[in-house]
Regions:
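Pre-recognition alpha-helix immediately N-terminal to the DNA-recognition helix
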Residues: 22, 49-52, 111
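N-terminal leader segment of winged-helix/HTH proteins
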Residues: 1-41
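N-terminal helix-turn-helix DNA-binding core of bacterial DNA-binding proteins
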Residues: 28-75
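C-terminal regulatory/oligomerization modules of transcriptional regulators
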Residues: 1-11, 86, 114, 129-153
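Charged, amphipathic alpha-helical coiled-coil/dimerization segments
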Residues: 81-139
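Alpha-helical linker/hinge and terminal dimerization helices associated
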Residues: 26, 30-33, 69, 112-130, ...
Length: 153
């Protein structure tokens, strides 16, 4: 938001005053910065965050993974099919309930973690934001994510 002097009034319809626009541009640009780091590994940003989640907790249902990543099944299903084709994950139907699909990392899915280990540091080296400012921003963004996920439609 731009600073205003005493003679100006806040314009709620000004593009520069839109939090959603600032978040959109930052998200788009950060993903653009990730692309040259991920492409050599055959990953997209979405497949990368999927792996990050699975490295934390493997053998989860598609529903759990979608909730964790804030992705709907229309986005997640083709992504998981592609990742399975790359040999990074397997999809297994539940024994008792055939509708439940479990996602597990393969040996390759676990091994690629080592190749991704320096990506966060490489991103920090691009001087996007120093750690002192990143921590409170991350807390604020998590609060926004929580609020949005729990807000009535």
């Amino acid at each position: 938001m731009k600073d205003m002097n005493e003679n100006q009034t806040f314009n709620p319809l000004a593009l520069d005053n839109q939090i959603c626009f600032a978040l959109y541009v930052c998200s788009k640009e950060i993903i653009r910065k990730y692309t040259p780091l991920l492409e050599p590994l055959g990953l997209t940003y979405t497949s990368y965050i999927t792996l990050l989640s699975l490295w934390e907790k493997d053998n989860v249902t598609v529903k759990e993974l979608g909730s964790r990543l804030f992705l709907d099944s229309g986005t997640l299903t083709p992504l998981l099919k592609k990742m399975e084709g790359q040999g990074l994950i397997t999809r297994t139907r539940g024994g008792k309930d055939e509708r439940t699909v479990f996602i597990q990392l393969t040996k390759d899915g676990k091994a690629i973690k080592k190749k991704c280990a320096d990506i966060p540091q490489q991103m920090m080296c691009q001087n996007i934001l120093d750690m002192k400012k990143a921590e409170p921003l991350l807390q604020t963004l998590h609060q926004i994510m929580y609020n949005m996920a729990n807000a009535p439609v």
